[in-house]
UniProtKB/Swiss-Prot annotation:
Record-given protein name: GTPase Obg
Keywords tagged on the record: Cytoplasm, GTP-binding, Hydrolase, Magnesium, Metal-binding, Nucleotide-binding
Enzyme Commission identifier(s): 3.6.5.-
Keyword match NAD: no
Residue sites binding GTP per the record: 166-173, 191-195, 212-215, 279-282, 308-310
Class in the EC hierarchy, top level: hydrolase
Protein family per UniProt: Belongs to the TRAFAC class OBG-HflX-like GTPase superfamily. OBG GTPase family.
Organism name: Rhodopseudomonas palustris (strain BisA53)
An example molecular function term from Gene Ontology annotations: GTPase activity
Length: 349
């Protein structure tokens, strides 16, 4: 399934039904009095977090969603039926923004969470409602209230326990495929990964969700390369695993490039726990490896882990370092569900 983390949609709640003007007409009852029923209430537009979703791709193919109108009132004091709500299914981690793309309306973090985004209009009163001691035969009724309409933005920030960051070709996808059942595209050219990938990792009987974020280059926060639009997905991660390619020209400069982009994107990423690892150590000579490790240690101001996603050397140590930060509690079913991609229509009801 294709990945989409942002979508613009139009929503409209249902109009209320009109009230009815009617009078009783029965045998032997000369003045039956008013009997017009009230109109039904319009349906609401509801956003709900669904299990098994991690993309907004369905909203690329359908952008307009309208709840059902309430039916009109009828004679014999019959009220109109309420309109059905329309429920839009979204993945956990979705944020709802107003049309200006800045005003946050709601942030969904729990499975099954529901939010009424637009309430249906109230039904109009029938003439029976206006009967009084001074007005025994009212001939007026109210129209139904109009529903609400608006354009909104859906923005997805995947919820994972740990995030993989680094320059393009740092070996992030290889690492993810090695430690989980995820099957990201792997090739020897930059920007092989074009959208985030999720995998469930099991280490020492404990599980956590790992997100592979497309590679960053210098100037990403200004739109270079794939830009920084995917960095929102690591904002919710508890820990970052920063992979540096040992075969690159200068490991210290590579680290500072990505670190600079993270800091430029959001201050919250500066506060994230970061584990630094020098990857692809199987592809360099011992002498060069020592130089790269020293360069990286000076730049990161911490001793980097040494590992190879291809041979598996150092991988268990990296995973245990992640688990130590994430905590000993096993990941919940809700988090694991975020790593499964299941087809789902956004529209129910």
């Amino acid at each position: 399934m294709k990945f989409l983390d942002e979508a613009k949609v139009y929503i409209r709640s249902g109009d209320g039904g009109n009230g009815c003007v009617a009078f009783r007409r029965e045998k032997y009852i000369e003045f039956g009095g008013p009997s017009g029923g009230n109109g039904g209430r319009g349906g609401d537009v509801v956003i709900e977090v669904a299990d098994g979703l991690n993309t907004l791709i369905d909203y690329r193919y359908q952008q307009h969603f309208k709840a059902q109108k309430g039916t009109n009132g009828m004679g014999k004091d019959r009220h109109g039926a309420n309109g059905k709500d329309i429920v839009l299914k979204v993945p956990r981690g979705t944020q709802i923004f107003d049309e200006d793309r800045e005003t946050l309306l709601h942030d969904f973090t729990e499975l099954g969470e529901r939010f009424v985004l637009a309430e249906g209009g109230n039904g109009g009163f029938g003439n029976a409602h206006f009967k009084s001691s001074t007005n025994r035969a009212p001939r007026n009724a109210n129209p139904g209230q109009e529903g609400e309409e608006r354009w909104i933005w859906l923005r997805l920030k995947l919820i994972a326990d740990a995030g993989l960051v680094g320059l393009p070709n740092a070996g992030k996808s290889t690492f993810l495929s090695k430690v989980s059942a995820a099957k990201p595209k792997i090739a020897d050219y930059p920007f092989t990964t074009l959208h985030p990938q999720l995998g469930v990792v099991n280490v020492d009987g404990r599980e956590f969700v790992l997100a592979d974020i497309p590679g960053l280059i210098e100037g990403a926060h200004e739109g270079a390369g794939l830009g920084d639009r995917f960095l929102g997905h690591v904002e919710r991660c508890r820990v970052l695993l920063h992979l540096i390619d040992a075969t690159c020209e200068h490991a210290g400069k590579a680290y500072k490039t990505v670190r600079g982009e993270l800091d430029a994107y959001a201050e919250t990423l500066s506060d994230k726990v970061e584990i630094v690892a020098l990857n692809k150590i199987d592809a360099v000579e011992p002498e060069e490896l020592k130089k790269q490790r020293d360069r990286l240690k000076r730049a990161a101001k911490k001793t980097p882990l040494l590992m190879s996603g291809v041979t598996g050397q150092g991988v268990p140590e990296a995973l245990r370092a992640l688990v130590a930060v994430i905590g000993e509690a096993p990941v919940s079913d809700k988090a694991k569900a975020a790593a499964d991609v299941e087809p789902w229509s956004p529209l129910t009801g």
